[in-house]
């Protein structure tokens, strides 16, 4: 028995080592979660008083919605009963009414013999469900409230029908602040012995925009690809344009003739694999920072909005890049005319 123990431990250690960091460092208890303390304290009170209602957790990706309800489930149920008491589904896998009539209905309608209390159905990405499926789910929730609690998780509250919203207690999870993200990222960096610079950490936080899942994925990918996490390697790994690239692009659009600007930007896009949508996002931030005359800023933002829309419906990047350069060159002429 003692000789076999190390060989039994090795597969478990290997599994932990091969796990994505998002799962490896997922909070296991409510106390491990780093934000939304007001929401967590309310849910903790529901659990301690055995009055957990149906829940609707909504907000941007990577803000702790799924981690929160999984931590609740682990507090409510022991490991051996978890599988029989908790049903976790991703509604985007099967968005139709069959998922409600099939696994959800059969799980909610059966009672457990040896365990008192309610079962828990966790429905992730519930905003992907069709309206018919949501209406069917409403009837299931009404019928089996006595022995089952439902937790719906979504990014967009507006895509959940009012009848479902009214049957749940709603909690909004906002994006995480840098002050909350940095200590948790530093913990992962220390545990994984990651070589990271200060500007690399800032780039991680900036690009993730309050999404902890995205921050951890970028951190792991950059570390594996380059062995060192700096601002440049983070931007290169994600295919996002560097600040110096944006500065060059803006300089070309405002100061060079059309042909030269187009040639230089196309060469840079090809060399670094940049997407025009990412360039447009960074240039948009620049427009708000610079003190343009109001009429000039309005003209430029309107043109950029049109370009973004046309990109979203699948038009040619080359044509839209031409349109972006033209918009900036017209802007340059307007500034000169108003001077």
UniProtKB/Swiss-Prot annotation:
Q: What is this protein called?
A: Replication factor C subunit 5
For this UniProt record, give its keywords in alphabetical order, as a comma-separated list. Answer: ATP-binding, DNA replication, Nucleotide-binding, Nucleus
Q: Which GO terms describe its biological process?
A: DNA-templated DNA replication; positive regulation of DNA-directed DNA polymerase activity
Q: Which cysteines are joined by disulfide bonds?
A: none
Which positions are annotated as binding ATP?
Answer: 59-66
Q: Name one GO molecular function term.
A: ATP binding
Complex and partners:
Subunit of the RFC complex, an heteropentameric complex consisting of a large subunit RFC1 and four small subunits RFC2, RFC3, RFC4 and RFC5; the RFC complex interacts with PCNA. Forms an heterotetrameric complex with RFC2, RFC3 and RFC4; this complex has ATPase activity but is not stimulated by PCNA. The heterotetramer of subunits RFC2, RFC3, RFC4 and RFC5 interacts with RAD17.
> Which gene does this sequence derive from?
Rfc5
Matches recorded under PANTHER family:
REPLICATION FACTOR C / DNA POLYMERASE III GAMMA-TAU SUBUNIT, REPLICATION FACTOR C SUBUNIT 5
Q: Which Pfam families match?
A: AAA, RCF1-5-like_lid, Rep_fac_C
| Function (record text) | Subunit of the replication factor C (RFC) complex which acts during elongation of primed DNA templates by DNA polymerases delta and epsilon, and is necessary for ATP-dependent loading of proliferating cell nuclear antigen (PCNA) onto primed DNA.
UniProt KW ATP-binding keyword? yes
At the top level, the lineage of the source is Eukaryota
GO CC terms of this entry = Ctf18 RFC-like complex; DNA replication factor C complex
């Amino acid at each position: 028995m003692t000789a076999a123990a190390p060989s039994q431990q090795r597969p478990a250690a290997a599994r932990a080592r091969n796990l994505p960091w998002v799962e490896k460092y997922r909070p296991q208890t409510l106390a491990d979660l780093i934000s939304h303390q007001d929401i967590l304290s309310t849910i903790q009170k529901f659990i301690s008083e055995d009055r957990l209602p149906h829940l609707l957790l909504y907000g941007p990706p990577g803000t702790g919605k799924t981690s929160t309800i999984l931590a609740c489930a682990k507090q409510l149920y022991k490991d051996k009963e978890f599988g029989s008491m908790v049903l976790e589904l991703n509604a985007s896998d099967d968005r139709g009414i069959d998922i409600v009539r099939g696994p959800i209905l059969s799980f909610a309608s059966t009672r457990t013999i040896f365990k008192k209390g309610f079962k828990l159905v966790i429905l992730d990405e519930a905003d992907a469900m069709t309206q018919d499926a949501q209406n069917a789910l409403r009837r299931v929730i009404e019928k089996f409230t006595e022995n089952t609690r439902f937790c719906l998780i979504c990014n967009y509250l507006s895509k959940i029908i009012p009848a479902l919203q009214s049957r749940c207690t709603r909690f909004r999870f906002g994006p995480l602040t840098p002050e909350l993200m940095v200590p948790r990222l530093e913990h992962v960096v220390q545990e994984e012995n990651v070589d990271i610079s200060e500007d690399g950490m800032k780039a991680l936080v900036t690009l993730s925009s309050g999404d902890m899942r995205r921050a951890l994925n970028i951190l792991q990918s950059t570390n594996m690809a380059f062995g060192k996490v700096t601002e440049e390697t983070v931007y290169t790994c994600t295919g996002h344009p560097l600040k110096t690239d944006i500065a060059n692009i803006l300089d070309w659009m405002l100061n060079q003739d059309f042909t030269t600007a187009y040639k230089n930007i196309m060469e840079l896009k090809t060399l670094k694999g940049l997407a025009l949508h990412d360039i447009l996002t960074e240039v948009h931030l620049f427009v708000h920072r610079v003190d343009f005359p109001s009429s000039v800023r309005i003209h430029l933002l309107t043109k950029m909005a049109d370009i973004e829309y046309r990109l979203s419906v699948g038009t040619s990047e080359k044509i839209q890049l031409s349109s972006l350069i033209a918009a900036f060159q017209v802007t340059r002429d307007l500034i000169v005319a108003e001077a």
